Swiss-Prot record:
GO terms for molecular function: DNA binding; type II site-specific deoxyribonuclease activity. Disulfide bonds: none annotated. The keyword Metal-binding does not apply. This is Type II restriction enzyme Eco47I. It comes from Escherichia coli. It holds the Pfam family RE_SinI. The gene is eco47IR. Its EC number is 3.1.21.4.
Length: 230
């Protein structure tokens, strides 16, 4: 995507029109998202579609973002990976870890399901934070529309943007980006430590939320969410 990318002048108006036709309840949030991308077009994620990559910032792209913004908020069930297991893994488990042959198939299947569970935890974390933060003006950038940023907030009084990136673990691959430009710093936070049994909720940025965010509340949210979509 070229550095010269820009959004059309009536991008915010188009954003409202497109989202009104999809889900009017999201129109205000999506309009602010497009307002942000209009000011920082270089922060826009590269579309997967090659056709759309040549139309970034145009009306068709704004509609594409609107659909992605909406669809990514719909309930999503965990699904097992479709990849075929590597049989050499079974050999390693048997010889190096003394796993008996009769247990290998069960362990491989449990591993597949565990991977599916791990893959959705990051999404569940963002959904939980969206439920807690959006009532106070933060916007979940659902649909991976913004590079290295998961939540944005516009401070109208000071005409400033606040940006937040969240990760499930401290060893999750992080984007190297720490700023968009013009000293717009991306705040970063992770939920759990990979080398010790501890969470990081106490270090959630105070300037982002004064709500009582904690592991117990997050786990309750996850249970309720999953039960509803069974």
């Amino acid at each position: 995507m070229s550095k010269e990318t820009s959004f059309v002048k009536n991008a915010e108006e188009l954003a409202k029109q497109k989202m009104d036709a999809i889900n009017p309840e999201l129109s205000s949030k999506f309009k602010f998202l497009i307002k942000f991308l209009s000011q920082f077009p270089e922060a826009c994620s590269k579309p997967r579609s090659k056709k759309m990559q040549n139309k970034v910032g145009q009306e068709e792209h704004i509609e594409y973002l609107a659909r992605s913004f909406h669809e990514s908020r719909l309930p999503r069930k965990p699904t097992p990976p479709t990849t075929v297991p590597d049989e050499v893994v079974s050999i390693v488990l048997n010889i190096s870890f003394n796993i008996q042959p009769e247990n290998l198939e069960r362990i491989k299947e449990e591993h597949r399901l565990s991977m599916a569970a791990e893959n959705i935890v990051g999404d569940l974390l963002e959904r939980y934070l969206a439920e807690k933060l959006e009532p106070s003006g933060w916007i979940w950038c659902s649909g991976t529309s913004v590079k290295a940023v998961d939540f944005i907030h516009y401070d109208e009084k000071n005409n400033e943007w606040n940006l937040l990136q969240v990760k499930n673990r401290d060893n999750t691959e992080n984007s190297s980006s720490s700023k968009i430009r013009d000293n717009t710093t991306i705040k970063k936070w992770f939920r759990t430590y990979s080398q010790r049994d501890a969470t990081n909720w106490d270090n959630f940025p105070d300037e982002v939320s004064s709500k009582n965010l904690n592991e117990e509340d997050f786990r309750a949210f996850v249970k309720n969410y999953l039960v509803k979509i069974i």
